[in-house]
Amino acid sequence: MRFNQYSYINFPKENVLSELKKCGFDLQNTANHKDSLETFLRRFFFTYQDTNYPLSILAADKKTDLLTFFQSEDELTADIFYTVAFQLLGFSYLVDFEDSDVFRKETGFPIIYGDLIENLYQLLNTRTKKGNTLIDQLVSDGLIPEDNDYHYFNGKSLATFSNQDVIREVVYVESRVDTDQKGLSDLVKVSIIRPRFDGKIPAIMTASPYHQGTNDKASDKALYKMEGELEVKLPHKIELEKPQLNLVQPQGQAELIAEAEEKLTHINSSYTLNDYFLPRGFANLYVSGVGTKDSTGFMTNGDYQQIEAYKNVIDWLNGRCRAFTDHTRQRQVKADWSNGKVATTGLSYLGTMSNGLATTGVDGLEVIIAEAGISSWYNYYRENGLVTSPGGYPGEDFDSLAELTYSRNLLAGDYIRGNEAHQADLEKVKAQLDRKTGDYNQFWHDRNYLLNAHKVKAEVVFTHGSQDWNVKPLHVYQMFHALPTHIHKHLFFHNGAHVYMNNWQSIDFRESINALLTKKLLGQETDFQLPTVIWQDNTAPQTWLSLDNFGGQENCKTFSLGQEEQAIQNQYPDKDFERYSKTYQTFNTELYQGKANQITINLPVTKDLHLNGRAQLNLRIKSSTNKGLLSAQLLEFGQKKYLQPYPAILSARTIDNGRYHMLENLCELPFRPEAQRVVTKGYLNLQNRNDLLLVEDITADEWMDVQFELQPTIYKLKEGDTLRLVLYTTDFEITIRDNTDYHLTVDLAQSMLTLPC
């Protein structure tokens, strides 16, 4: 384990003493260090009647147990302090470590022995081996009462609200959209779990079209075969109009009653970060949105009608929209428990909705935590004039996602009444998708949140993985740079795939978000501020560094690609084409081994480089015909240890999100030997070689100069490493699988790779 502590706030000594005293640690500034440590530990072991026993089973050094040490005349030393501290954090002395000084250096332990009271205060705010901070572990065990009131420690809310005796209710928010054109505003179901509190509380809201269930069977039927010919497009300039949103006004009167009438029973799934905040005094709201089970309307996936309906839930929390008790719309209930302040959470589609909501500038949305979210839907299902699939899901497109998320069809009555209209709407969507050309058009323009990024007022926290080929890093990169300069923005850029990171051992992500939301949603005045970029170092396990920016580098390193012309044959023998189409993983393996139709260029790294931004290929290239698909991947090549893209379980169900509440696994990205690691990749239709909105002819056997930016990333390379650039045509995981007989030729002498560093 390595300690990477971003959540700790330096407080004045009087605040430290006061907070310690409230938790029963009655330490005196004038006492000597040894006495203070004993006082601290006897309170620490509050679950024991006889505190001599837990002291006797800890060690001060290799020869002395802690009780014996306190009974001796020996002085407290830095070595003894560290030895005790690590044992309190769950490390076994003489098993996990023997030399505390060596161990603290190896683990990056954040505490430097000096002022013992401040040391002990920071120790309580440090994460244990099992994933909780020490103070959270003690509170979970009953250090302070579960009195349904707020208690703060180091600028963070503690788990002092009951997660058993909570209010569970359902309301139906009246949206300002009518997606199915029935002349009535769509209703959106809101599932609420909130702690009991005599006052107003903030809300954690997760906008998830998956929450009420998904129609996997219908979605699978809507998948496309990826085999087909790359379209030869007519040259033209793509024209667009400003997206429009038509809103509807509230209709009719509804009796105001005091409480919701529908009780929330079981929910399909919760998000463990939300679970963590519930006993800390934050309501949990789960909203599936229009076109989902128990709501009304069509599934409009990603457009501002869908976003508006989610926004209207925040409006209801602030008294600007109505919520009914049921679908009759006869009785309404106010969110009189809400303080109006909201944070959004969730990954993938959930993070996408956070991005979209932020761009409305809605009042009350204080923070978004957008994890692996889409910023422009075109870049999810298309790339540079190509029809593409999200990584791992060949054949998926917007209409199959619509079938997946239109969960109203899971209710037989809704299916009978509404499926015909839903299918008619889906046919319109299919026509607008334009799978034929892969070009950007008005349909995608209406689902581009970057156009409204200037409206964002909330503080923004992103998480994204360098190995996320589902929602590719371009999404967070573009959103990060499109935000107004005056707002606070932060990015946790890890080396995983399309994954959550709130339960990783190496970083105090949950505690950092707690500090932020306690400040922004509960009004606690602290100096807490996250760095702009927190990056997971790819060269070592469990190592995180603060950076000033994502991209924007002034310096670059250029690699020449060679001296000769090389060709990429597009067509494969039928046997290989069928084999790759059946299992794209086989294609990826053979591509990395140099066995596919490809140009492979090994580039030795002659000095340390820190890539930060978008690698760019400048290629002189020609096609043997009037079309061309170019794929590129940049690898770090060579057998060595690399961080793996998916977290592994270190310890099962050891993280406590409250008081024995929603226990979850402690995880981390493994660091183990592999033959290579993908650094970045990209795909380009050569007819869109100069601009996404400009389609140009390709003249057979005529040279073209192409500038091709790959996916943005942050990646460290060391002298002696090897980069491998792979250029090819069809990518059997991502692109259309065109097996026509043509080839691309690259003049390597007139081509180069540029890395921002």
UniProtKB/Swiss-Prot annotation:
It catalyses: Hydrolyzes Xaa-Pro-|- bonds to release unblocked, N-terminal dipeptides from substrates including Ala-Pro-|-p-nitroanilide and (sequentially) Tyr-Pro-|-Phe-Pro-|-Gly-Pro-|-Ile. The active site is at 348 (charge relay system), 468 (charge relay system), 498 (charge relay system). GO terms for cellular component: cytoplasm. It is an enzyme of class 3 (hydrolase). The keyword Protease applies. SMART domains: PepX_C, PepX_N. InterPro entries: AB_hydrolase_fold (IPR029058), Galactose-bd-like_sf (IPR008979), Pept_S15_Xpro (IPR008252), PepX_N_dom (IPR015251), PepX_N_dom_sf (IPR036313), Xaa-Pro-like_dom (IPR000383), Xaa-Pro_dipept_C (IPR013736), Xaa-Pro_dipeptidyl-ppase/CocE (IPR050585). GO terms for molecular function: aminopeptidase activity; dipeptidyl-peptidase activity; serine-type peptidase activity. The keyword Cytoplasm applies. Its EC number is 3.4.14.11. Keywords: Aminopeptidase, Cytoplasm, Hydrolase, Protease, Serine protease. One of its GO terms (biological process) is proteolysis. Pfam families: Peptidase_S15 (PF02129), PepX_C (PF08530), PepX_N (PF09168). Disulfide bonds: none annotated. It is found in: Cytoplasm. PANTHER family: COCE_NOND FAMILY, PUTATIVE (AFU_ORTHOLOGUE AFUA_7G00600)-RELATED, PEPTIDASE S9 PROLYL OLIGOPEPTIDASE. Belongs to the peptidase S15 family. HAMAP family: Aminopeptidase_S15. Homodimer. Removes N-terminal dipeptides sequentially from polypeptides having unsubstituted N-termini provided that the penultimate residue is proline. This is Xaa-Pro dipeptidyl-peptidase. It comes from Streptococcus pneumoniae (strain P1031).
